[in-house]
């Protein structure tokens, strides 16, 4: 009886989580199959990066969208940067790789918090604009640089990049769009 009571308390959480996942999947412009493929590819890319035995000073973050991989973070030197690219390109299913890692020390926790706040501010501004579907765009921030990826038309891409470049705190915007046909 106690187990039944405990399990029934979990039901609302399971239902809410399932509804959230379903809504996010439905809003994404990629097909469900593409979303699953990207999720699987992201796991394989992460594994390849961890197996590449990059030095502990390297902080490489991968973002996968439409089979394309965007690398951000910090690496100690160009050799490590090239090793990260090589590791990603060895993964079957990677269509294209943008290596936007920067040479230097890893960013501080304070900068990571600032970047999270900046990304949230950008997403809010994009969400409030009537001509942008936030579900089509991924926003990645790294040391006040903003990296945009997603499925857009050339005009949408220009408009979003321009809007993001005017957000307070943004030092630079780099786009890695997949263009709609």
List the model feature ranges, each with a label.
Residues 4, 9-181:
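N-terminal targeting leaders
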């Amino acid at each position: 009886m106690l187990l039944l009571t405990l399990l029934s308390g979990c039901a609302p959480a399971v239902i809410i989580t399932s509804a959230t996942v379903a809504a996010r999947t439905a809003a994404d412009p990629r097909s469900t199959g593409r979303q699953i493929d990207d999720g699987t590819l992201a796991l394989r890319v992460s594994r390849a990066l961890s197996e590449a035995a990059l030095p502990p000073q390297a902080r490489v973050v991968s973002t996968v969208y439409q089979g394309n991989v965007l690398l951000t973070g910090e690496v100690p030197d160009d050799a490590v940067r090239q090793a990260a690219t090589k590791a990603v390109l060895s993964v079957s299913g990677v269509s294209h790789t943008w290596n936007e890692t920067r040479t230097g020390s890893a960013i501080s926790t304070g900068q990571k918090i600032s970047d999270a706040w900046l990304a949230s501010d950008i997403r809010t501004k994009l969400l409030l604009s009537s001509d942008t579907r936030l579900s089509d765009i991924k926003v990645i921030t790294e040391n006040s640089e903003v990296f945009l990826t997603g499925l857009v038309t050339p005009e949408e891409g220009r408009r979003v990049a321009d809007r993001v470049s005017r957000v307070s705190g943004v030092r630079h915007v780099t786009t890695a769009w997949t263009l709609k046909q």
